[in-house]
Swiss-Prot record:
InterPro entries membership: Ig-like_dom, Ig-like_dom_sf, Ig-like_fold, Ig_V-set, TCR_variable_domain
Listed SUPFAM superfamilies: Immunoglobulin (SSF48726)
Keyword vocabulary terms for this entry: Adaptive immunity, Cell membrane, Disulfide bond, Glycoprotein, Immunity, Immunoglobulin domain, Membrane, Receptor, Signal, T cell receptor
Protein's name according to its UniProt entry: T cell receptor alpha variable 12-2
One of the protein's GO biological processes: adaptive immune response
Disulfide bond positions: 44-110
UniProt cross-references to CDD domains, sorted A to Z: IgV_TCR_alpha
Main subcellular location: membrane
Native species: Homo sapiens (Human)
A GO molecular function held by the record: peptide antigen binding
Signal sequence residues: 1-20
Length: 113
């Protein structure tokens, strides 16, 4: 019985640590419709001011998410038609997709570390 109590305490401590490590992230909701050739803007806000790294993933239907951009310092980071923008003071990160194409139709996810 003593070993069961010790095991439960250890499990509780591990769950408490996992719970404390969760960060709240919010993306703009609903589908975004953009004309071909236009700029698509996706936004994400986060709650933890200590967050250091920010990631954007693209997921095509039936496929696994793929990393398309990451950013860790304020300002803009460009990669081809994609630009990630980070403002740590306002706690937001955005993804701009220039010259939108039909192949850009996917689910976009932001993540914070």
């Amino acid at each position: 019985m003593k070993s069961l109590r010790v095991l439960l305490v250890i499990l509780w401590l591990q769950l408490s640590w996992v719970w404390s490590q969760q960060k709240e992230v919010e993306q703009n909701s609903g589908p975004l419709s953009v004309p071909e050739g236009a700029i698509a803007s996706l936004n994400c806000t986060y709650s933890d001011r200590g967050s250091q790294s920010f990631f954007w993933y693209r997921q095509y239907s039936g496929k696994s998410p793929e990393l398309i951009m990451f950013i860790y310092s304020n300002g803009d980071k460009e990669d081809g038609r994609f630009t990630a923008q980070l403002n740590k003071a306002s706690q937001y990160v955005s993804l701009l997709i220039r010259d939108s194409q039909p192949s850009d139709s996917a689910t976009y996810l932001c993540a914070v570390n």
